Amino acid sequence: MAPAGRPGAKKGILERLESGEVVIGDGSFLITLEKRGYVKAGLWTPEAVIEHPDAVRQLHMEFLRAGSNVMQTFTFSASEDNMESKWEDVNAAACDLAREVAGKGDALVAGGICQTSIYKYQKDEARIKKLFRQQLEVFAWKNVDFLIAEYFEHVEEAVWAVEVLKESDRPVAVTMCIGPEGDMHDITPGECAVRLVKAGASIVGVNCRFGPDTSLKTMELMKEGLEWAGLKAHLMVQPLGFHAPDCGKEGFVDLPEYPFGLESRVATRWDIQKYAREAYNLGVRYIGGCCGFEPYHIRAIAEELAPERGFLPPASEKHGSWGSGLDMHTKPWIRARARREYWENLLPASGRPFCPSLSKPDF
């Protein structure tokens, strides 16, 4: 199957999803740019769009080449409560970078907001909605294609975000950073999905905090909740690029390896192909990743779902399906690995003789 660029007028996000098309999101920005030296851990704010625009542009380009057809603005935690006077310039610059790269392929631009830093301490609906509305005004000015409210651990705040984003004429997606146990107020994933759709979201799901397997379990519960309530919405999943089956209700942030010792937990490209297929079989059509999800992980989604999409991404020009490029290797035992069965059944070692398989969460 040859790579293709899909020329022509771009369809909107809902038009794509309603036709059954697979939409591939992007992946990790904060964790990846921290590793590359452009984001400060702890603050996790996106000044890099102004201070190091080439680094952000390059990462967008890598995701586009890997198969992403959504360029999400790098505006995580870019609200006034986190960035004070810099918030407006950061949001505007992030939109410009995402639009520039999206224009090089069949990609849409999504303006992204996330949970605020003040909800846990002061549930001031008017103040929180004002913060969301400020970012929305920039997204409208920059004419993003649709909107994403992501990384919400409380459904009440996520509903407030959806209500604000619905003030625009753009489609709204919302993802919560919850596992099968539900949000931090013990509201089930199914009930969370119902409340979000009733608030006006067209696309619902989960992102971050949990690995692919756990995130798909949560998606199944969301889907069941919507079906039981007689509601319809498109489903979206963007998990970690890490394995974290041992984390607690708060997700990987409670693991002792977070954030600087997660490398031994990185999912392989083959893990991600399995995740992509399982997500598709569950009925999810917006499939991407979050923290730890590198461009090669996105390529794995695009390759696994190439039969459904009808084309491969440009990055597949240098990548043989299921290791097929290894059949040219000079060593016979490496040539023997040029097959799906080998990689699909491999249980990778960590190389650390005293490394435990699982950790005990700190919280």
From Swiss-Prot:
<dbReference type="InterPro" id="IPR003726">
    <property type="entry name" value="HCY_dom"/>
</dbReference>
<keyword id="KW-0489">Methyltransferase</keyword>
<keyword id="KW-0808">Transferase</keyword>
<comment type="function">
    <text>Involved in the regulation of homocysteine metabolism. Converts homocysteine to methionine using S-methylmethionine (SMM) as a methyl donor.</text>
</comment>
<protein>
    <recommendedName>
        <fullName>S-methylmethionine--homocysteine S-methyltransferase BHMT2</fullName>
        <ecNumber>2.1.1.10</ecNumber>
    </recommendedName>
</protein>
<feature type="binding site">
    <location>
        <position position="291"/>
    </location>
    <ligand>
        <name>Zn(2+)</name>
    </ligand>
</feature>
<dbReference type="GO" id="GO:0005829">
    <property type="term" value="C:cytosol"/>
</dbReference>
<keyword id="KW-0862">Zinc</keyword>
<feature type="modified residue" description="Phosphoserine">
    <location>
        <position position="321"/>
    </location>
</feature>
<comment type="subunit">
    <text>Homotetramer. May interact with PRNP.</text>
</comment>
<dbReference type="InterPro" id="IPR051524">
    <property type="entry name" value="BHMT"/>
</dbReference>
<dbReference type="InterPro" id="IPR036589">
    <property type="entry name" value="HCY_dom_sf"/>
</dbReference>
<dbReference type="GO" id="GO:0046500">
    <property type="term" value="P:S-adenosylmethionine metabolic process"/>
</dbReference>
<dbReference type="GO" id="GO:0061627">
    <property type="term" value="F:S-methylmethionine-homocysteine S-methyltransferase activity"/>
</dbReference>
<dbReference type="GO" id="GO:0032259">
    <property type="term" value="P:methylation"/>
</dbReference>
<dbReference type="GO" id="GO:0070062">
    <property type="term" value="C:extracellular exosome"/>
</dbReference>
<keyword id="KW-0479">Metal-binding</keyword>
<comment type="pathway">
    <text>Amino-acid biosynthesis; L-methionine biosynthesis via de novo pathway; L-methionine from L-homocysteine (BhmT route): step 1/1.</text>
</comment>
<feature type="domain" description="Hcy-binding">
    <location>
        <begin position="11"/>
        <end position="305"/>
    </location>
</feature>
<dbReference type="GO" id="GO:0008270">
    <property type="term" value="F:zinc ion binding"/>
</dbReference>
<dbReference type="GO" id="GO:0033477">
    <property type="term" value="P:S-methylmethionine metabolic process"/>
</dbReference>
<dbReference type="Pfam" id="PF02574">
    <property type="entry name" value="S-methyl_trans"/>
</dbReference>
<keyword id="KW-0597">Phosphoprotein</keyword>
<dbReference type="GO" id="GO:0071267">
    <property type="term" value="P:L-methionine salvage"/>
</dbReference>
<dbReference type="InterPro" id="IPR017226">
    <property type="entry name" value="Betaine-hCys_S-MeTrfase_BHMT"/>
</dbReference>
<feature type="binding site">
    <location>
        <position position="290"/>
    </location>
    <ligand>
        <name>Zn(2+)</name>
    </ligand>
</feature>
<feature type="binding site">
    <location>
        <position position="208"/>
    </location>
    <ligand>
        <name>Zn(2+)</name>
    </ligand>
</feature>
